[in-house]
Amino acid sequence: MRNPDYLPYQRKKKSWLRVFSTLVVMAVAAGLLYQIPFINSRLRWRLDLAYTYMSMLFNPVQDLPTPAVEVAAEEQLFTLTPTETLPPTATPEPTATPIYTPTPTLVPTPIPGQVQLTPPAYDELRDAQALNNCGPATLALYLRFFGWEGDQYDISKIIKPEAKDRNVNVDELTYYVRNYSGWLKSEFRVGGDLETIKEILAAGIPVMIEEAFTIDRQYWLDDDQWSGHYLLITGYDDAQQMFTTHDTELGPNQHILYDELDDRWQAFNRVYIIVYPPEMENNLINVLGENWDVDTNRQNALETARRETEEDPQNAFAWFNLGTNLTYFESYNEAFDAYRTAITLKLPQRMLRYQFGPFIAYFHTFHTEDLLALTKTALQISRTSEEAMLWRGWAFYRQGDTGTALNYFRDALKINPNFDQASNAITYVQNN
């Protein structure tokens, strides 16, 4: 006879409602935790890696398509009339830049053999770059050198609101400084050299550059692992032939040899960004000399690129830089030839994630089918590239397909709602 005080053990029957509720709670909790920047920055790239790798298994990456030499006559039938405004080719409007006036007795001032500026304190949690955020993260370090108190997220929410956007351009970074930093000013120039970096450092100003970088993992089969990256330079040492840099991927106080930096820098037309307080502007003008003038600076960069193609005709980056500088001067036919040579020599897979001169040159030389092929490849590798979407849209517009063009322009705005070129494109197409 069972004792009435005996309470037999019974396995609880599974309640699917309870299981479902638990899963929902876990999912919500995971979602909330994912919003914490520290956790987000460490998980997002893994999710992005998994997604990219799987998608590339079914759609393998190809080399950049080589354009045709001749343009079919029918491609030139659909064109913009002379009274219409061509699509814009540059983002934010530059602010007025003081004119450089050379002095009759311009004698170079010797600089010391070593300069080490004191960088801002580096906080791993705050300063290590979030996914695809090296531009804002590096700029945040740069601004804090002058006492700014924000961080990379303050910058990215303005110029890169979508975390999946894999690139921030130098003009977007300077735009942020000019409009949101409070009191600081900013310029960027191209065709830099090691002496220019050293002279700016000797004047008490760090230098930010864009350079080539080898990532530590493959995102797809046969990934060449080449990417673009921003770097803050705060010192140099002639005796060791070495720069001191601060890298939001590798950490503070890194060192790189002069020749290695120049080699990595060439891939980006040796572009450099300068941030400075207004009271240092006259000193900076004297340091840059004729390169303070934007057009003169670009002409000098053009001559450097042309010389480097002659010295090393197999250097794809030299040809690409030549095309980029020719595009600036609207010499589109010659630019197209330079880009075609660069692509034939083989460029890195991610090259068009960061630089878009070929899109512009192809469009203006009526290589519309080639532009469609090029932007298709660019979007396969960088599916959130608003610049590739923009120029793919213009290619469809040139073919008379305004509906598809508008769809691409709107897609570009989904990635970056502040992308004025896409907004202007929509307005243009709807009014013409």
Q: What do the PLM-derived regions correspond to, one by one?
A:
Residues 217-220, 224-225, 234-325, 329, ...:
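Noncatalytic regulatory segments and standalone regulatory/sensor domains
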